[in-house]
Amino acid sequence: MSRKCQLTGKKANNGYSVSHSHIRTHKLQHANLQWKKVWWPQGKKWVKLKLSTKAIKTLQSKGIQAMAKQAGIDLNKF
């Protein structure tokens, strides 16, 4: 499975590590992804998703049904 949030689509960012002598080397800044089991009340079941921590915070205010609809995800497949 890829390192990508299943609800927001958040993924790694290309950046540079800059040393004291200003030598720049490429580095990936990965999203903070967590496996999270979320209760889906409409489906009456637990859904296990790989979510960014930002998405977990947004879930608490919006709810899983609204976020899944916005992302175009069918929760029955999880």
Curated annotation (Swiss-Prot):
GO terms for cellular component: ribonucleoprotein complex; ribosome. GO terms for biological process: translation. One of its GO terms (molecular function) is structural constituent of ribosome. The keyword GTP-binding does not apply. Gene3D superfamilies: Ribosomal protein L28/L24. Keywords: Ribonucleoprotein, Ribosomal protein. The keyword Ribosomal protein applies. Belongs to the bacterial ribosomal protein bL28 family. NCBIfam families: L28. This is Large ribosomal subunit protein bL28. It comes from Trichodesmium erythraeum (strain IMS101). The gene is rpmB.
